[in-house]
Amino acid sequence: TPDSFSDGGKFNTKKKSFLQIKKMINSGASIIDIGGESTRPGSKTINPKIEWKRLSGVVKNFKTKFKKISLSVDTRKLEIMRKSLNYKVDLINDVSGFSYDKNSMSFIKKSNAAKVLHHMIGTPNSMQNNPRYNNVLLDIYDYFEKNLKKIGSMNVLVDPGIGFGK
């Protein structure tokens, strides 16, 4: 993304993305996580069409180029999750904890893809604006306990969201 916190938009073309992916794989990466919408603090939500346009070149071609490497798509939007899974994406990483779209939790629960259940209060745009916890560790633990019951605990990674309002 043009406003990415990880690379500052250096790999925002299909060609540059694949060159960086090859470099990461050659360095030992076995999972590649890509996103078309920045989730850095203060970032704004973008239209799903723009997000898919940014992702689709990699998502549509990844498995033909890198059969043994897992592809993770970082998105909050159900539409992007669906499209990505049509191209055999291995993992969906949602910083909203599958709560941005009211139907994403039930959708992803039915999917065989691995999932990253993330903790964040608010949105990327607001998460740093005075987040409140009774006890940060217990609050996060309770969040995961509650949401793992909803999503199921098979094929789920949990991400406490360090830097996302903590």
Predicted regions: what is each one?
Residues 1-3, 37-39, 76-78, 95-98, ...:
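Active-site beta-loop-alpha junctions enriched in small/polar residues
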